[in-house]
């Protein structure tokens, strides 16, 4: 008897075998040599009742360490922020949840308008002219920005600060690995911030672009105005990898003359989930509009004069120009872009500003507590991350903290041995005063501080 919801019943098997003229499964696989044919049943247990299975999986899941069971001070690119309940409610609508690239605008106006709103929000945050419909993640956006700079300027050198996320630097090097003419010059830091003298000396007439992070990977806030002054007469592009939440408080890169602003909207409505998926953004100037990678949604009018939305400037893309396309990127992160759009819209300008201030104040409170506990904090001005120096390996301290329901900061020795015994601590709006005090107290005790 066929079963309506369970596939591959005995009746299903019989009907398929009859259709192809085989009397049994053994006859179906008769061409497979006997010496390699599996001659036993697969060791798969019988099915369980849904109630039993749910309980068993819940027991297994309860062994996980999560930000719901522990207070988390881990950041380094993935942060523990609050997402309003409306985010999941809205993105769970089937029209959004199952949609793909809206090639047919006449039946995809809702999806296209949602993407258009995302582009608009990114432009407002970054103070740039145009933004694409999103990219896979912030690091992909950064690497694509560098490729754009090479192609636009026809120069072969990118000057990058070592204050950029170390994985962003790795991805960039992977992108240019097969292009021997391209050179990536890394500029050292002075403590936790870019050494401006070395940066200025590294920039010359062969420089395609200068790239920095804002705030940088170590939490410090780079002097974008000063850096831009080094670039102006060199005809190089200025690329800024920015934390979009920080832009609720900090002056946006566009105000400092940035040519391309990229980043990751994970702080807006995208949970910290095994490192992804994320949502990269890419914003630039009108001058570079036809060089931008990825999808672009534009606003137009139909034959009756009604406002409508379409995919525009598609001649840049792979499905039109193939090998002459501006990028190999031919998709986006529509669902996560929608989540970020809903989150930003729900918070509003004031809400984004308020959360940015909470991050800044919580981090500065934590910095002061660490200093009071006798630990050295490397940063001057920072947003919601900073570096703390310990006397012992950070791994040992984090292992001990985990036993006390605390997820410690990122172990910077994973980036370089130069950062041995140094922890990158992230403090978001979700950390309470009690959680911060407990974290500092326990970390100080484990370090042997006062």
UniProtKB/Swiss-Prot annotation:
Stored InterPro entries? GcvPA, GDC-P_N, GDC_P, PyrdxlP-dep_Trfase, PyrdxlP-dep_Trfase_major, PyrdxlP-dep_Trfase_small
EC identifiers of the protein: 1.4.4.2
Task performed by this protein: The glycine cleavage system catalyzes the degradation of glycine. The P protein binds the alpha-amino group of glycine through its pyridoxal phosphate cofactor; CO(2) is released and the remaining methylamine moiety is then transferred to the lipoamide cofactor of the H protein.
Q: Give the matching HAMAP family.
A: GcvPA (MF_00712)
Query: Which terms are listed as keywords in the entry?
Result: Oxidoreductase
- Please state the span of the N-terminal signal peptide per the UniProt entry: none
**Subunit note:** The glycine cleavage system is composed of four proteins: P, T, L and H. In this organism, the P 'protein' is a heterodimer of two subunits.
| Catalysed reaction, written as an equation | N(6)-[(R)-lipoyl]-L-lysyl-[glycine-cleavage complex H protein] + glycine + H(+) = N(6)-[(R)-S(8)-aminomethyldihydrolipoyl]-L-lysyl-[glycine-cleavage complex H protein] + CO2
Q: Which domain of life is it from?
A: Bacteria
Q: What is this protein called?
A: Probable glycine dehydrogenase (decarboxylating) subunit 1
A single GO BP term for this record reads: glycine decarboxylation via glycine cleavage system
Q: Does the keyword Oxidoreductase apply?
A: yes
Record GO terms (molecular function): glycine dehydrogenase (decarboxylating) activity
Output the Pfam families linked to this UniProt entry. Answer: GDC-P (PF02347)
Q: Which CDD domains does its entry note?
A: GDC-P
Q: Which family does it belong to?
A: Belongs to the GcvP family. N-terminal subunit subfamily.
Matches recorded under SUPFAM superfamilies: PLP-dependent transferases
């Amino acid at each position: 008897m066929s079963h309506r919801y369970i596939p591959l019943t005995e009746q299903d098997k019989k009907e398929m075998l009859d259709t192809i003229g085989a009397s049994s499964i053994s006859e179906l696989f008769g061409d497979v040599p006997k010496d390699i044919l599996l001659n036993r049943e697969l060791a798969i247990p019988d099915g369980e009742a849904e109630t039993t299975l749910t309980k068993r999986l819940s027991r297994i899941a309860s062994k996980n360490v999560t930000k719901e069971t522990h207070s988390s001070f881990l950041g380094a690119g993935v942060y523990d922020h609050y997402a309003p309940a409306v985010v999941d409610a809205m993105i769970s609508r089937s029209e959004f949840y199952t949609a793909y690239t809206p090639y047919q605008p006449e039946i995809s106006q809702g999806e296209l308008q949602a993407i258009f709103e995302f582009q608009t929000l990114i432009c407002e945050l970054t103070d740039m002219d145009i933004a694409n419909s999103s990219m896979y993640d912030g690091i992909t956006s950064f690497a694509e920005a560098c490729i754009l700079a090479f192609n636009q300027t026809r120069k072969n050198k990118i000057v990058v600060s070592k204050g950029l996320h170390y994985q962003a630097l790795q991805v960039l090097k992977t992108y240019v690995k097969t292009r021997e003419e391209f050179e990536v010059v890394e500029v050292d830091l002075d403590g936790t911030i870019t050494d401006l003298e070395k940066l200025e000396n590294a920039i010359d007439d062969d420089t395609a672009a200068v790239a920095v992070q804002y705030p940088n990977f170590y939490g410090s806030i780079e002097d974008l105005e000063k850096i831009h002054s080094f670039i102006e007469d060199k005809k190089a592009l200025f690329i800024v990898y920015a934390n979009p939440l920080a832009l609720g408080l900090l002056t946006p890169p566009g105000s400092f003359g940035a040519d391309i602003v990229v980043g990751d909207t994970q702080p807006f409505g995208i949970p910290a989930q095994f490192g992804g998926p994320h949502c990269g953004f890419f914003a630039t100037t009108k001058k570079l509009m036809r060089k931008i990678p990825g999808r672009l949604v534009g606003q137009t009018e139909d034959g009756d004069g009604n406002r409508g939305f379409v995919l525009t400037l598609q001649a840049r893309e792979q499905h039109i120009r193939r090998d002459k396309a501006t990028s190999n990127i031919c998709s986006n992160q529509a669902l996560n872009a929608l989540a970020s759009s809903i989150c930003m819209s729900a918070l509003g300008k004031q809400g984004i500003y308020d959360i940015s201030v909470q991050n800044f104040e919580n981090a500065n409170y934590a910095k002061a507590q660490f200093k009071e506990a006798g630990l050295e904090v490397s940063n001057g001005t920072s947003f919601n991350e900073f570096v703390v120096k310990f006397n012992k390996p950070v791994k040992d301290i984090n292992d001990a903290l985990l036993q006390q329901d605390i997820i410690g900061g990122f172990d910077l020795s994973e980036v370089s041995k130069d950062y041995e015994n140094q922890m990158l601590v992230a403090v978001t709006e979700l950390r309470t005063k009690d959680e911060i005090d407990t974290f500092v107290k326990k970390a100080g005790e484990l370090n042997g501080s006062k």
